[in-house]
């Protein structure tokens, strides 16, 4: 009767390609390993600070951005912090924080803050990977490029309110016009 079957009898594929695929899917891919591969591919300067943390320097149009990504297994979150130096005079802090509020209202993912003690403008974002999800290289690459693009977009607005005599609303109009002008 076996000869009458239109196809050979099924056999377990556990030892073949299926086992390899299952092994790959079950394997823990560390998000920082993915980031390191991206940094190497893009030829960015980077330093693997720890098993769960990496720091990079990424060139933008306006300046070089320091980007740090850290993985928290406990929180199941890949946290990205993109920073650049900014030393506003004390009397400009109010208008800077007003600009931060205006800008953050425009940001759909991530948010800016200013770290006064370190004199750093910070754009941060947390990628939640709960339930054992694994971040893809595309997700992480997009996370980094979005951080740089967002920082580049609003950099002129920060400069106008901190070092010029522009209001937060005026500076935002310049940032919006700049974005549309390049589109």
Language model region names:
Residues 121-125:
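Short, aliphatic-rich beta-strand segments
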Residues 115, 127, 133, 140-152, ...:
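Long, contiguous binding/interaction regions
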Residues 84-89, 127-135:
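A generic structural motif
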Residues 1-17:
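Short, Lys/Arg-enriched N-terminal segments with co-localized hydrophobic residues
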Residues 37, 41-65, 69-80, 85:
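Ser/Thr-rich, low-complexity intrinsically disordered terminal regions
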Residues 83-120:
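Short, internal acidic amphipathic alpha-helical interface segments
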Residues 159-183:
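Short, highly charged C-terminal tails/helix-capping segments
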Residues 23-38, 42-45:
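Negatively charged, low-complexity tracts enriched in Asp/Glu with abundant Ser/Thr
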């Amino acid at each position: 009767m076996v000869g009458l079957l239109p196809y050979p009898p099924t056999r377990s594929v556990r030892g073949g390609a299926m086992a390899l695929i299952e092994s790959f899917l079950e394997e823990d891919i560390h998000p920082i390993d993915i980031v390191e591969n991206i940094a190497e591919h893009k030829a960015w300067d980077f330093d693997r600070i720890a098993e769960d943390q990496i720091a990079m320097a990424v060139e933008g149009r306006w300046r070089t951005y320091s980007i740090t990504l850290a993985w928290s297994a406990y929180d199941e979150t890949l946290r990205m912090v993109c920073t650049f130096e900014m030393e506003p005079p004390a009397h400009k802090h109010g208008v800077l924080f007003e600009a931060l509020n205006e800008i953050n209202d425009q940001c759909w993912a991530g948010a800016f803050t200013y770290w006064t003690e370190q004199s750093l403008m910070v754009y941060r974002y947390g990628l939640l990977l709960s339930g054992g999800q694994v971040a893809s290289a595309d997700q992480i690459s997009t996370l980094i490029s979005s951080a740089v693009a967002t920082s580049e977009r609003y950099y002129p607005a920060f400069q106008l309110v901190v070092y010029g005599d522009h209001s937060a609303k005026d500076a935002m109009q310049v940032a919006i016009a700049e974005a549309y002008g390049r589109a």
